């Protein structure tokens, strides 16, 4: 299973919070996830207050180091497929991009988003981080 996992932002954030980063190495994410993770950490620190800003900075630093050891995919040239998938599944374009990349690259989609996991399961194999810990 290792080496064929595509982590979405929700699973990346969960792995960061658990400090369980080993599974990320030599696996996949996409460059949009980098912004999604940073945005989620900013939101938790600045708007929700569930973590301090210093903790958010620390997690971003760790995440930046981990990404260096991941294979980072691009949604290009799949833009039309992504829009079509978003329309078909009634999910955001961001979520659809993970489904399309998992399908095109033959990867297992790792997501903590139950709704996405259910909607995508007929198209790609989906799992939660908890399924592989």
Describe each model-derived feature in a short phrase.
Residues 1-19, 29:
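Metal-dependent nucleic-acid phosphoesterase active-site entry motif
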Residues 2-4, 29-30, 99-133:
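Acidic, PIN/NYN-like endoribonuclease modules and their adjacent C-terminal/linker elements
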Residues 10, 35-38, 57, 80, ...:
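Non-catalytic, well-ordered alpha-helical scaffold segments
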Residues 14-15, 36, 81, 118-119:
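Phosphate- and divalent-cation-binding pockets in alpha/beta enzyme and binding domains
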Residues 16-50, 54-58, 71-73:
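PIN/NYN-family metal-dependent endoribonuclease catalytic core
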Residues 38-42, 64, 83-86, 99:
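Amphipathic alpha-helical segments within well-ordered protein domains
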Residues 51-64, 115-121:
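Membrane-interacting alpha-helical segments
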Residues 69-108, 112-115:
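Active-site neighborhoods of divalent-metal-dependent phosphate/nucleic-acid chemistry enzymes
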């Amino acid at each position: 299973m290792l080496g064929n996992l595509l982590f979405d932002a929700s699973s990346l954030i969960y792995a960061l919070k658990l400090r369980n980063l080993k599974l990320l190495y030599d696996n996949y994410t996409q460059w949009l996830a980098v912004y999604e993770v940073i945005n989620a950490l900013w939101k938790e620190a600045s708007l929700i207050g569930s973590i301090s800003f210093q903790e958010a900075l620390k997690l971003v630093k760790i995440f930046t180091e981990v990404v260096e050891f991941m294979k980072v995919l691009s949604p290009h040239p799949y833009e039309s497929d992504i829009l079509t998938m978003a329309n078909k599944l009634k999910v955001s374009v961001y979520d659809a991009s993970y489904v399309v990349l998992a399908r095109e690259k033959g990867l297992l989609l790792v997501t903590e988003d139950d709704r996405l996991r259910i909607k995508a399961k007929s198209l790609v194999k989906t799992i939660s981080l908890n399924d592989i810990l």
